[in-house]
């Protein structure tokens, strides 16, 4: 089954919050190295999609599975689609879009996503976990997801009142065919204003199943504080 599953990691060098974020050192490995190595432990069909020669150079000791992409993409989804086209992925193959700033996604979670995707009718699958504190609700770097009783997403926000809010984890799964359809849509106003590409899916009536992961996952890396917390987490392991 893993032969028909691909993990694609979009990564760009520019970041409004952290300069050269993918290359930030976290206990002896760069952020993007940690994400990529985790993915390769799950499947050899793991690739980084980037527009940066610096990122490519940083990863060459790990794997040659680097796809160079345009620097004009407005979202990771669009970058992943370009990479998927270059890899000639089949229409019904499952693509997992793993965010390049999520270094602590466990293998157990990836396997859960694959299983839930096969069991639930959906266009897109993503992940949520428990809110750790009230700070998650008020932190704009922590994306919240609300879902209905069948675990289909109803909204994503950075801050707001939700009926049943959970912390959104940056991973998406879809077939190549669905990915192609999504990237042909115009970005929505809410997507651009909130910098949440998943709103494009939702506002165009694509069903998003939210796989609930009932274990703690450290936050992704968006700020210098996140970097410090990641180092503390690794030092405790």
What are these regions (language model features)?
Residues 2-50:
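N-terminal glycine-rich phosphate-binding loop and ensuing alpha1 helix
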Residues 43, 89-92, 119-123, 206:
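Short, high-confidence coil segments that cap the C-terminus of an alpha-helix
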Residues 165-237:
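Conserved alpha/beta core of the MobA/IspD/sugar-nucleotide pyrophosphorylase nucleotidyltransferase superfamily
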Residues 47, 53-115:
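Short phosphate-binding loop-to-helix
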């Amino acid at each position: 089954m893993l032969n028909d599953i691909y993990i694609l990691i979009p990564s760009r060098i520019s970041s409004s919050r952290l300069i050269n974020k993918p290359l930030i050192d976290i206990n002896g490995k760069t952020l993007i190295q940690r994400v990529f190595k985790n993915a390769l432990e799950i499947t050899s069909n793991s690739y980084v999609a980037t527009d940066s020669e610096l990122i490519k150079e940083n990863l060459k000791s790990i794997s040659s599975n680097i796809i160079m992409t345009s620097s004009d993409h407005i979202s990771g989804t669009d970058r992943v689609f370009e990479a998927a086209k270059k890899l000639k992925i089949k229409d019904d193959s499952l693509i997992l879009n793993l965010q390049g700033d999520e270094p602590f996604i466990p293998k157990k979670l990836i396997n859960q996503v694959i299983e839930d995707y096969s069991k639930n009718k959906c266009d897109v699958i993503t992940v949520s976990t428990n809110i750790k504190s009230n700070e998650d609700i008020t932190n704009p770097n922590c994306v919240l997801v609300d879902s209905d009783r069948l675990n289909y997403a109803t909204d994503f926000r950075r801050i707001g009142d939700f009926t049943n809010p959970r912390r959104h984890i940056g991973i998406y799964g879809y077939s190549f065919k669905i990915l192609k359809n999504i990237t042909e849509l115009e970005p929505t106003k809410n997507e651009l204003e909130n910098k949440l590409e998943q709103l494009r899916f939702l506002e165009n009536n694509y069903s998003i199943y939210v796989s609930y992961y009932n274990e703690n996952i450290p936050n992704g890396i968006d700020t210098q504080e996140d970097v410090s917390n990641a180092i503390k987490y690794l030092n405790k392991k």
